[in-house]
């Protein structure tokens, strides 16, 4: 005879997940320049890219070994930062060098030019130079965004763009109007006449969400939690089955 004892554990854990910028504006994953092989456009190419003769190339086009005006224009626009077509070839602009023309000769050793200032890297705020589908840009740690991680984006400190836990305040993030706490995860007030009870918002008919900030579908007085997304909570279900065997 065999018996089974199953225990279901259900837990709710507040999460403060952050979202780095790892995709370009078209939703494609950014490819780190440092991951692209130097001197190889064969089987070792990375996402079809290789650094050949000192410059970043799309291997399929580079292998044609013919000068293609369309590709040279494309290369200057997509695979370079400061470059232009000169005498039919994509060439770094004056004082610029490197495989993607992002290194500036006019700055000190180990520095480059960003805007009008010399900085250690073209990517600001510890970003990483990368290749996108439309242009060279940077992978950015939260809460930074923009082509070169130059723009503060406090929404990147939360797991969902619909959360309002943080807001921009100059060059740093502070808690949103309805939140407090070290991680801005303590609700201090609700929207749409919701009532704050034991740290949670009790929403009136027609609204739902952490702050009662979401309106139910037209014609529905109440909202099913199954159809809503709860960004501040991580639900974990652990199923533990212990089998007992009797002989």
From Swiss-Prot:
Compartment(s) where it occurs, according to its Swiss-Prot or TrEMBL record: Membrane
Signal sequence annotation: 1-17
Q: Check the record and name the PROSITE patterns matching this protein.
A: EGF_1, EGF_2, EGF_3
Cytoplasmic compartment ranges equal 241-247
Q: List the disulfide bonds.
A: 123-138, 140-149, 190-201, 203-212
User: Topology with regard to the membrane?
Assistant: Single-pass type I membrane protein
**This protein is called what?**
EGF-like domain-containing protein C02B10.3
Q: Does the keyword Transmembrane helix apply?
A: yes
Q: Listed GO molecular functions?
A: Notch binding
Q: What residues does the EGF-like domain cover?
A: 114-150, 180-213
User: Can you tell me which residues are glycosylated?
Assistant: 126
Q: Which GO terms describe its cellular component?
A: plasma membrane
Q: On the Extracellular side, which residues?
A: 18-220
Under InterPro entries, the record lists: EGF-like_dom
TM ranges:
221-240
What keywords tag this UniProt record?
Disulfide bond, EGF-like domain, Glycoprotein, Membrane, Repeat, Signal, Transmembrane, Transmembrane helix
User: Principal place where this protein is found?
Assistant: membrane
GO biological process terms, alphabetically, are: negative regulation of Notch signaling pathway; Notch signaling pathway
């Amino acid at each position: 005879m065999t018996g089974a004892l199953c225990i279901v554990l259900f837990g709710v854990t507040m999460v403060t997940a952050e979202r780095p910028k790892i995709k370009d504006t078209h939703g494609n994953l950014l490819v780190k320049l440092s991951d692209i092989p130097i001197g190889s456009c064969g089987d070792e190419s990375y996402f079809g890219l290789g650094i050949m003769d000192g410059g970043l190339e799309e291997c399929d086009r580079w292998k044609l070994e013919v000068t293609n005006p369309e590709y040279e224009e494309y290369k200057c626009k997509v695979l370079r930062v400061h470059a232009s077509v000169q005498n039919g070839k994509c060439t770094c602009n004056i004082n610029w060098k490197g495989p993607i023309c992002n290194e500036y000769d006019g700055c000190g050793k180990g520095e480059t030019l960003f805007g009008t200032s010399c900085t250690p890297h073209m990517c600001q705020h510890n970003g990483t130079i990368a290749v996108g589908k439309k242009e060279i840009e940077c992978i950015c740690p939260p809460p930074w965004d923009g082509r070169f991680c130059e723009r503060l984006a406090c929404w990147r400190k939360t797991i969902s763009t619909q959360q309002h836990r943080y807001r921009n305040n100059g060059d740093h993030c502070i808690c949103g109007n309805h939140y407090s706490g070290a991680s801005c995860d303590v609700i201090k007030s609700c929207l749409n006449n919701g009532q704050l009870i034991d740290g949670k918002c009790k929403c009136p008919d027609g609204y739902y969400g952490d702050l009662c900030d979401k309106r139910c579908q037209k014609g529905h007085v109440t909202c099913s939690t199954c159809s809503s997304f709860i960004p501040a909570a991580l639900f974990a279900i652990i199923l533990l089955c212990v089998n007992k065997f009797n002989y």
